[in-house]
UniProtKB/Swiss-Prot annotation:
It holds the Pfam family Ribosomal_S11. This is Small ribosomal subunit protein uS11. One of its GO terms (molecular function) is rRNA binding. Keywords: Ribonucleoprotein, Ribosomal protein, RNA-binding, rRNA-binding. InterPro entries: Ribosomal_uS11 (IPR001971), Ribosomal_uS11_archaeal (IPR019961), Ribosomal_uS11_CS (IPR018102), Ribosomal_uS11_sf (IPR036967).
Length: 126
């Protein structure tokens, strides 16, 4: 247990795509990266839970080859004045990492939330 080597998995999940980037614990060096378009060719499948599971499985293999056996997860939705809930791929990716035998430390939500930023798109509602 003392020889745990940790990394950080940044999962950006929207309703159009899911991007997973794995960095070292400081976030400076990228260890592995995958997006929906690298796994499936149809644009409609990029954000699906199945694609996210495939991506996480591939990344787990790469991490094991590099000697990393634990990850902290940071989930991010589009945020800002867009949607604040992550897409369908986020939860599937987390489950796939756990099933692949990678130990999960922390899971945190890092979606950017505006402190009364720009006006949201769409008409006025009365």
């Amino acid at each position: 247990m003392a020889d745990m080597k940790w990394a950080v998995a940044h999962i950006k999940s929207s309703f159009n795509n899911t991007i997973i980037t794995v960095t070292d614990i400081t976030g400076a060096e990228t260890i592995a990266k995958s997006s929906g378009g690298m796994v499936v060719k149809a644009a409609r499948d990029e954000s699906s839970p199945y694609t996210a599971m495939q991506m996480a499985g591939q990344l787990a293999d790469q991490l094991r080859d590099k000697g990393i056996n634990g990850i902290h997860i940071r989930v991010r939705a589009p945020g800002g004045n867009k949607q604040r809930s992550p897409g369908p791929g986020a939860q599937a990716a987390i489950r796939a990492f756990a099933r692949a035998g990678i130990r999960i430390g922390r899971i945190e939500d890092v979606t950017p939330v505006p402190h009364d930023g720009t006006r949201p798109k769409g008409g006025r509602r009365v």
